[in-house]
Amino acid sequence: MRATNMKKTIFQAHLLLAAMVAVTLLSTVSAFAAAPGIKGTTFNLVAAPAYLNQPDGQAVYSWGYGCATGFTPTFVPTLSRAGVCNVMQVPGPTLIVTEGTQVTVTLTNNLPISAGNTSILFPGVTLGAFTDGTPGLLTQEAAPGATVTYRFTAPSPGTRAYYSGTQGDLQVEMGLYGALIVLPAPASVPSNCTSGMATKNLQAEGAHGEVDYRLAPAAYDHPDTCYDREYLFQFAEMDPRIHTQAEAQVTATAGCVTGAAGCSLNVPTEPYHPAYFLINGRSMPDDMDPNYATEYPHQPYNGDPHMHPGELTLIRVIGQGRWQHPFHEHGNHVRILGRDGNLILSSSASTLSYEGVPATPLAGPLQFTTTTTPGLAFDGIFYWTAKGLNWDAYGHNPTSADPLATLTCTPDANGYNTGDPTAINYYEWCQDHFKPVQKAPFGDVAGNGPVTLPDANLFTNGAWYGGSPYLGPNATTRATGCITTGQPNGPSGSQCGQTGSTPPSGTIANPPGSEAGFAFMWHSHNEREITTNNIFPGGMLMMMLVDSREYVIDETN
């Protein structure tokens, strides 16, 4: 770590982090995630040192993989911020390949000479014969200043980790890890993933100006792995004392000659006391800033998931550190599809039909907390609808003069409104249509429900509160800023947007007038891990925003 005082008072650190959270949230209203990376068959990488920025103001000396000078990668998906692949980043570049293709990864060791050899380990991938490099304990290595080339045929689809296979207790801790995503071959994509409901969901996105940022229509070669949106999260922790000692020893051995006495590092990696807990190389709130944000030149990837009701959201998760992290997704369970590219199928000989495509049924568990095991990757589907709320999430009101408040809900065979993909209540749970939640609402929503909301003057709104119990800016504006005929405490006629109990101020991360989504915290269930250097909030924490269709999820950030 750079020469900074690690012994700041808790009070000073708390004030600093609180200020950082506030400033970051002001700029994260439209910062989303997707699963950005570089795609191709040839990747020229380097391992090099740099500093990682942390929310408490620290810059931590680290090592990471990056793109070699002169290598021009193909960035996917196309984002409004130009993709950046510096010579060092944490996590390393997400390598995106297609099943069955021949892949070549060349690694040049630009670490300090005293750091010794380095390498890349691709667990579960069969490598071809080596023509360069130095044999190591687990894989072929690159000596300081030298190069090693890894060749393999891209295996079955799915998400996998890659990381250093050399002195892993130090090199992985220092940041030498990344993700390998294998996409299904185009001919292997199940037909139902490009037709039927999959097509309707794309129509729903297009009707509101959204673009398809998926890497593929399916996660695996299986008809029950279709998805509508995707995110990649790599979990790791960092003990700054190890990094500080590594930097000090590198400085002390600067200019040494490979193989000479004393030209090596002897950094203790135990006892282990991490202070930073990272999602995609960043701690909260930094993880909610955009991908490729210039303030994080060596931490390009964010963690800021969004979705619409009814979408199948693929989450790709990798445990990259030394510890196991219980990743808790509020809002619903995650259906595990596979681990390390191995689809979990039923042992039964029976088959099911998925929109006319027969296949062996999946057997992955449903988990409300998905454990991220060191070195292990999994793919899972997160799904959310308003079913089970027991009130109309869109605040429909049959007596309203607003046409969006009187939309119809025609149930399909599963009870959802899927007939018109252009409607803002596409995928509404029709059983709760027009069902009120508030007993005596002020605004233009149905009344005579079971709930009296607390007085807005008696509590403070959280940064992610959408402004009302309803989904979307139309419903929230009606609920908080309108008086209409038939409401128990208002005059006759319709007066919308003139007065109201709110929309509330202060909800800067989920503005009531433009987004008004339902926010679900996604975080480590080891509560210490949602801190930054022991200060809450921070660490492994992000928010999943479920947004109404009227809100455009613009993942070009």
Describe the residue ranges of each PLM region.
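Copper-binding active sites and cupredoxin-like electron-transfer domains
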Residues: R2-I10, L17, T24-L25, V29-N557
